[in-house]
């Protein structure tokens, strides 16, 4: 029997595209949902029957009672954060598994993150302050602590104290105090007690699901392509690989294991934090998009910067990820605009370009305007959309060279058009 392929959901803007709703909507078709990278800086908001769920580490498939949910080795895991998140749900044993190879994001990582951002002043990247960068830095520097070490909290405590002693001068500069050893040990024992039942070799779990059990597996990325450490708007990026290729390293699978790739995009664009954003609208339309779309970060609560759909960035991200189709989210937020705009090219040094240069700071958007429409909210069939909205979708398909296969017309799970 040939191995089954794993399908992949990937954000192809600056994160916050609505991946959570799509994973939740599709999860009933899958036996396993896997998260491959990032940490509790990422946030999914899912509405089911009027109830809001905020997820940061747990895969969105958790709302499907029959799905197994996996947090892979590429994730940096905050024990405190995931334990709080788990309180939203019951009977998680056997439904949630955490890689023993995932790295720990501990409280001092957040302190380092916040201290460094403060030192940068007006040159700060605008991180969430959740310690993601420092946790990944420890991983790359080969001094990180892994989730599997929680199974022996006494030994882990010794390692953390040793780490502080070896980096005493650095911590002193950042005004971070060494933890009390006894208090630290009790804290780690608490984490160990609550998380030990969920810690396992998740790579073997996924291999078995694909190779032997013929399970349907869905892979879930965090953040978005434009925040990728290599291919995003560096240095205003996250610390992990957010593209489809990153799912392989973050879960321990190979490229041949990937089947269908679905790219998630909003019908407009948003960004949290600093960094270039070519199609940002600083006027009344941008403000209106933010108000209608309730554009506040799930993790930070910060207002998101808003602008028009950037087809240049979308085409780039779709090609980079190998997207088979797009899921177009929040189409209803554009309801009522007299006209809507699409960024179809950039101007750089007086010349028109249709690609992303390494630095987006100096590009200016070139727009095409299209007639707006009255209402798409709640539509569940393509035929129910106004002609202008249908034309808008076709324009996006044409410019991005990727078909739109899913359309979301409200936050509710069922207000989704599958083409």
Swiss-Prot record:
Binding site for GTP: 15-21, 43-45, 304, 330-332, 408-410
InterPro entries: Adenylosuccin_syn_GTP-bd, Adenylosuccin_syn_Lys_AS, Adenylosuccinate_synth_dom1, Adenylosuccinate_synth_dom2, Adenylosuccinate_synth_dom3, Adenylosuccinate_synthetase, P-loop_NTPase
Positions contributing to Mg(2+) binding: 16, 43
Pathway: Purine metabolism; AMP biosynthesis via de novo pathway; AMP from IMP: step 1/2
Cystine crosslinks: none
BP-aspect Gene Ontology terms: 'de novo' AMP biosynthetic process; IMP metabolic process
Cofactor note as given: Binds 1 Mg(2+) ion per subunit.
GO molecular function terms noted in the UniProt entry: adenylosuccinate synthase activity; GTP binding; magnesium ion binding
Subcellular location as annotated: Cytoplasm
Annotated GO CC locations: cytoplasm
Broad class of where this protein is predominantly found: cytoplasm
UniProt-annotated catalytic positions: 16, 44
Binding sites annotated in the UniProt record for IMP: 16-19, 41-44, 128, 142, 223, 238, 302
EC number in record: 6.3.4.4
Keyword vocabulary terms for this entry: Cytoplasm, GTP-binding, Ligase, Magnesium, Metal-binding, Nucleotide-binding, Purine biosynthesis
Cofactor(s) listed in the protein's UniProt record: Mg(2+)
UniProt binding sites for substrate: 298-304
Catalytic reaction list: IMP + L-aspartate + GTP = N(6)-(1,2-dicarboxyethyl)-AMP + GDP + phosphate + 2 H(+)
Pfam families: Adenylsucc_synt (PF00709)
HAMAP family: Adenylosucc_synth
Function statement: Plays an important role in the de novo pathway of purine nucleotide biosynthesis. Catalyzes the first committed step in the biosynthesis of AMP from IMP.
Family: Belongs to the adenylosuccinate synthetase family.
Assembly mode: Homodimer.
Record-given protein name: Adenylosuccinate synthetase
Organism encoding this protein: Sulfurimonas denitrificans (strain ATCC 33889 / DSM 1251) (Thiomicrospira denitrificans (strain ATCC 33889 / DSM 1251))
Highest classification ranks of the organism: Bacteria, Pseudomonadati, Campylobacterota, Epsilonproteobacteria, Campylobacterales
